[in-house]
Amino acid sequence: MSIIDNRKAFHDYFIEETYEAGLVLEGWEVKAIRAGRANIKEAYVILRGEELFILGMHISALQSASTHVETDPVRTRKLLMHAKEIAKLIGKVERAGFTLVPLDLHYAKGRIKATIGLAKGKKQYDKRESEKERDWERDKARLMRVKT
């Protein structure tokens, strides 16, 4: 079950592969995400050494958040993955020109996980072509519904 989706990623990129990664979060962030107060539309994943980090993910603190904790809504958050998976991603990102984008946040065994996609950027004409295809599929379904 998805908590937050990044539909813009599917519009802007061709998603080749998806991976699941854990997130290093603070307590107030977990509560805010459970309340649906997170945004990953402008977020992206970077590599620093042998580690993955997510930047641009905005988590708005709840009103009930502690006053003793300084809440930074757009801080850099570390992603947790197996070393072999990270090594494979590093190779593809550095050599093949791929980029990493967060696709959604979801629960897995009670923990909040992020699905990240190995993606290539779409050109403007690719976006138009995808839109035409979507429209044609919708029209085709409508025509089939009318005839039967």
Curated annotation (Swiss-Prot):
Listed GO cellular component terms? cytosol
Positions the record marks as coiled coil are: none
Matching entries from InterPro entries are given as: SmpB, SsrA-bd_prot, SsrA-bd_prot_CS
Renumbered to this chain, region (Disordered) spans 127-148
Source taxon at top rank: Bacteria
Which family does the UniProt entry place this protein in? Belongs to the SmpB family.
Please name the NCBIfam families in this protein's record: PRK05422.1, smpB
Q: Entry's HAMAP family? A: SmpB (MF_00023)
Q: Which protein is depicted?
A: SsrA-binding protein
Organism, as annotated: Aromatoleum aromaticum (strain DSM 19018 / LMG 30748 / EbN1) (Azoarcus sp. (strain EbN1))
Q: What is the lineage of its organism?
A: Bacteria, Pseudomonadati, Pseudomonadota, Betaproteobacteria, Rhodocyclales
